[in-house]
């Protein structure tokens, strides 16, 4: 705003000094003509009026009062100054004050680049100054002050058992849920926790600390809250039409491939968590449908409540199919592992492990009554075998075994026959004894017949 001041000669700064003179008689006609023109132009626009009253107008139009023309000029100047001040105040009220104020702010001076700090998803803050390390942990759970409501791309991540890149805070909560017995808690992920406890645990999780002795239902509720408070849902990339047309396992597999890498890894981790809960259904009463039902509303975000409810039902069926597929993959993997172990194991070791209890009856397995019964039968068979060999010794005339050697040494054939592998079972020995008796009787009958024939 330009400031005006009076000089000693009643002039203005920036304008030449003006000395009014009395007009002559020949100029009165011009004065009257100017007054007529003023009256005609007064009804046009206010701009003409302002222009006519500016300090730059001719002195002839304002010299009608003679000696008072100098005072009129000062009044006009003051009016112009007030008019400009009003215009500037109106412009500042319309928001132009920001533009004017920005011109008064200069560029920063004496700036020094101390350090360059970046956040890595796997290593946390990199390049952190040493004076800030006590306040900010180098492996912070998130680049933000909170782990909730933050994108997974700006959080510290780790790898799970399946090789998925998952936020570390989720893996810590999962581990603590398992160690606290959450898989066997009835109604896990379905029972809502206490709000007071949840807020306290939230503050600790924002610092990257999972407290011990936490309520498993509170921890399960925070896992669902993490998915619910994401900026974008895990399944928001998929349209409702795509999820609705997903009816078979093949359709679900093709639909998972369409997800971005970050969302796909988080979904696979979540499906594994749900499958672990379903495996303990006999304790927690949560089957595949129940777990999918409580997780479905947290996987998508929609503004319309009715549309969100309909879409949640479709997402529930999608999650249920993925859970059943995960359980089937686990069963197939376990069966394959058992088959490979059986193929790679030594046959002799396997035979010894299977017959260790039978071959050593003096060390029966007291925890298994079946093996105890087998050991008892083995001892009975051993007694029968001893009686059988005593019968053989008494029947030396039949030539079955030669036990009357002069030096008392046992031959190699006899030593081989006494090996446990070649000892007969009870039923076989009975059959052998009966066949031997029948053969002896048959030979005696043939010998009597032959003796009765007339030679």
UniProtKB/Swiss-Prot annotation:
- Map out region (Disordered) in residue numbers: 1-68, 342-366, 432-455
Which SUPFAM superfamilies does the entry mention?
GTPase activation domain, GAP
Where composition is biased (Basic and acidic residues), the residues are 24-33, 435-446
Q: What is its main location?
A: membrane
| Molecular function in Gene Ontology | GTPase activator activity
Please give the tissue specificity annotation from the record for this chain.
Expressed in differentiating xylem cells.
Q: Where in the cell is it found?
A: Cell membrane
What cellular component terms from Gene Ontology apply here? Answer: plasma membrane; secondary cell wall
Q: Where is this site: Arginine finger?
A: 190
Residues in domain Rho-GAP? 153-331
- UniProt-listed GO biological process terms: plant-type cell wall organization; signal transduction
Which residues lie in Low complexity bias regions?
Answer: 43-54
Role, per record: Acts as a GTPase activator for the Rac-type GTPase by converting it to an inactive GDP-bound state. Involved in secondary wall pattern formation. In association with ROPGEF4, mediates local activation of ARAC10/ROP11 to initiate the distinct pattern of secondary cell walls in xylem cells.
Query: What is this protein called in UniProt?
Result: Rho GTPase-activating protein 3
Q: Which organism is it from?
A: Arabidopsis thaliana
Q: Which gene encodes it?
A: ROPGAP3
């Amino acid at each position: 705003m330009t400031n005006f001041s009076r000089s000693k000669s009643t002039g203005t700064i920036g304008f030449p000094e003006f000395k009014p003179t009395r007009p002559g008689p020949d100029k009165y006609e011009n004065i009257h003509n100017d007054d007529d023109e003023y009256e005609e132009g007064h009804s046009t626009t206010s701009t003409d009026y302002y222009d006519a009253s500016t300090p730059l107008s001719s002195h002839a139009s304002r010299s009608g009062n003679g000696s008072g023309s100098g005072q009129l000029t000062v009044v006009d100047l003051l009016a112009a100054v007030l008019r400009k001040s009003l215009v500037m105040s109106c412009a500042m009220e319309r928001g132009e004050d920001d533009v004017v104020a920005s011109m008064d702010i200069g560029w920063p001076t004496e700036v020094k680049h101390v350090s360059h700090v970046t956040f890595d998803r796997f290593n946390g803050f990199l390049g952190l100054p040493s004076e800030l390390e006590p306040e900010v942990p180098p492996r912070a759970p998130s680049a933000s002050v909170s782990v909730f409501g933050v994108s997974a791309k700006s959080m510290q991540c780790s790898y799970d058992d399946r090789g998925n890149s998952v936020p570390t805070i989720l893996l810590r909560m999962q581990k603590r849920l398992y160690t606290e017995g959450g898989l066997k808690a009835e109604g896990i992920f379905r029972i809502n926790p206490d709000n007071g406890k949840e807020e306290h645990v939230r503050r600790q999780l924002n610092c990257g600390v999972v407290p011990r002795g936490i309520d498993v239902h509170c921890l399960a509720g925070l896992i669902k809250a993490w998915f619910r408070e994401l900026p974008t849902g895990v399944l928001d990339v998929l349209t409702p039409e795509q999820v609705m047309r997903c009816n078979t396992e093949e359709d679900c597999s093709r639909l998972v491939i369409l997800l971005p890498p970050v969302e796909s890894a988080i979904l696979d981790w979540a499906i594994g968590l749900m499958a672990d809960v379903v495996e303990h259904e006999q304790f927690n009463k949560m089957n595949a449908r129940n777990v999918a039902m409580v997780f479905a509303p947290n996987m998508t975000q929609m503004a319309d409540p009715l549309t969100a409810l309909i879409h949640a039902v479709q997402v529930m069926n999608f999650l249920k199919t993925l859970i059943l597929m995960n359980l089937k993959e686990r069963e197939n993997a376990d069966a394959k592992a058992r088959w490979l172990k059986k193929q790679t194991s030594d046959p002799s070791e396997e035979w010894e492990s299977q017959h260790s209890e039978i071959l050593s009856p003096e060390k029966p397995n007291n925890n298994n009554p079946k093996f105890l019964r087998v050991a008892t039968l083995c001892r009975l068979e051993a007694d029968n075998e001893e009686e059988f060999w005593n019968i053989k010794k008494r029947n030396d005339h039949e030539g079955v075994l030669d036990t009357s050697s002069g030096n008392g040494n046992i031959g190699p054939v006899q030593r081989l026959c006494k090996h446990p592998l070649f000892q007969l079972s009870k039923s076989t020995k009975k059959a052998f004894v009966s066949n031997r008796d029948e053969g002896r009787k048959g030979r005696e009958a043939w010998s009597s017949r032959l003796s009765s024939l007339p030679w």
